[in-house]
Amino acid sequence: MEYKIIADGACDLYGENADKIGVQIVPFYVAFEENVYKKEGAEIEVRHFYKEMVENPTVFPKTSMPSVQDYVDVFTPIVKAGEGVLCICITTKFSGSYNSAVNARNMLLEDYPDAKIEVIDSTLNTVEEGIFVREAARMKAAGLSLEESAVSYTH
């Protein structure tokens, strides 16, 4: 079965870096003083995010995890196309992103009981999660199935 690799934005892979290895990113939301949350990497460039931090050192950004609906919106077309999903999330110690993805999976399994959706808590964050995601992409390119890839990360 063909499958897609999905990762949350905590892996720090955006744009060409994610596209090059065939990974779709579900972004986190960020806000500064105005409290308008924007999708990191999609609605606010990562470069702009860091520029805001440098130019306003006393203003601390707030973040919010991807919602269940964000994951449903990404998983649904993949499942409808008959493909599997391997979703890699930031450690549950830092975020509820994994729980959002699990809830989205459970919702989709109600309508698509044969869907193959694996959600993995990477137990990592930022660059380390990115390395984890790159390794998953390498394993997929080497021909490992969704199940083989998921098992290698959960055991």
Can you say where each PLM-predicted feature lies in the sequence?
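N-terminal glycine-rich phosphate/adenylate-binding segment common to multiple enzyme folds
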Residues: 68-101
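Structural beta-sheet core signal
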Residues: 5-7, 87, 119
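Active-site histidine-anchored catalytic micro-motif
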Residues: 90, 96-150
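Short, surface-exposed connector motifs at secondary-structure boundaries
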Residues: 57, 81-86, 115-116
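Conserved small/polar residues in nucleotide/adenosyl-binding loops
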Residues: 154-155
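A short helix-to-beta-strand connector/capping loop
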Residues: 1, 21, 113-116
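N-terminal glycine-rich anion-binding loop in soluble enzyme alpha/beta folds
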Residues: 4-68
